[in-house]
Amino acid sequence: MSDFVDRVTVHVKGGDGGNGSAGIRREKYKPLAGPNGGNGGDGGSVVFVADRNATSLLDYRFMPHRVAGSGTMGLGDNKDGSKGEDLILPVPCGTVVFEARGEQGKAKHPGAQLADLRHEGDRCVVAQGGAGGLGNIALANKTRRAPGFALLGELGEERDVILELKSIADVALVGFPSAGKSSLIAAMSSVKPKIADYPFTTLVPNLGVVIAGDSRYTIADVPGLIPGASEGKGLGLEFLRHIERTEIIAHVIDCATLEPDRDPMSDYHALENELALYADKLELPLGAIPIPERPRIVILNKIDVPEAKELAEFVRPEFEKLGLKVFEISTASHEGLKELNFALSALVHEMREEVANREQAEEEARVVIKPLETKGRRPRRADEGGSALEFTVERRELGNGEVFFEVRGVKPERWVMQTNFDNDEAVGYLADRLAKLGVEDELRRKGAHPGDEVRIGRGARMVEFDWDPTISAGAEMLDGSNLGARGKDLRLEELDPRTHRRSNAERRAQYHEMMDARAAVRDAMMAERKAGHWADPTVDDDRHDETSLFGHGESSEDGETEE
């Protein structure tokens, strides 16, 4: 099995965010000191990085499933969870990342291009990690001072991507099968490709580094092309993409072929036609030179054969009339290789400068609008408002006549994932958020009634429930209610002196009530004094008669009250 793999499908998943904590602070003499649950850690992301030491995508064929680290849950004492570790995956320079499209269980095909990792260090985040859930200390506010719940961490992004390697070489050797391309790259570099005397010996591209004095450049040996390669015939369509990144195209022509209806000029025009058809389908990167405009050279091979030598001298003027540089070589005797080597080196140096100038000019001409920088992947505020444009509500009807309402939107779907439906307070908090966003108003506008089925999200993350409209976003809006707002612990309210602060009117009313009580006591004492209770020594102080402050008359021995 070849160790060269230039296309693979990889399943990537970002790490899940950690759950928030719903801890309650406990101290000596303060059994209920308020919330102190920390936030969950964010999940790690899956990142592809262009690495010059990577040469193939073979590792991803045997290990196609890659998952980043998940964040840990928050803890009490306001301790946040740790962030999941990012998964850094090296790929060869020249790798293009595509979105994979296709039905589940079937072969995927490339969709939209996500990134073009052409240079060393280029990065692409293909699966974002999930955000950690907020702890109850982050959910607290002036009306919800002791939340008994926390938010769950979000799931990491999960998707299939296709990695496609397009070799980055300075020179591409193109030609018919058995034209001597592999022999040429073996003679000019240290690469040892498979060489045999039958067509299509080369099944994968070979890259070799060639040294010419103080400079060096790379050559790509592309498998043999035949007429119809741009439409998928032979092996050409699989490897024509390796020509996209080369700046110079070298036609290797076999002057010793014995096949009928073939000659150097017809071979050249046939291959040029295939390259032109393939170039029409390409979307070139920034600063790239279109394939038809790239410089060409013609290499007439196998001149060690006398008949081939004569044919090369005969067709050379025809190629020169087309403005092409022609080199006569023999890979067997190494004749003409030195001249070819230094000529290619000079041409490569010239093209590198031209490409650099093109990229700089294109970059300066672009208008870049930078978005506002925000810390984190989303606002850390719990009660996020919004407008109706951030979600959609559609009325759906099933085949059996049942009707349901489908809610789609980034915020509603994320809030559903963050909610622990085993906690009634968390469910009520979700209802408040949806009402504040305007979901309930939109449901009413679409004709929804209490008890109708509502679905939020899609796929495995979808949540179904019977709609029960809230009352002005919760109990905290009900004046005079003893229920308290969601997240309000009445035990804490009793311990907080701020909740018992009296108004001036209440202070005046309490003062007048106290003064009236004192006046009543003074009047009772004056009545006892006038009755002589305090001046008569024969009166028992413990006796309670009708003149006493607490007396109601004294009973006689026969049970009758004395007058």
Curated annotation (Swiss-Prot):
Its cofactor is Mg(2+). It is found in: Cytoplasm. GO terms for molecular function: GTP binding; GTPase activity; magnesium ion binding. Residues 383-469 form the OCT domain. GO terms for biological process: ribosome biogenesis. Mg(2+) binds at S182, T202. HAMAP family: GTPase_Obg. This is GTPase Obg. It comes from Bifidobacterium longum (strain DJO10A). The gene is obg.
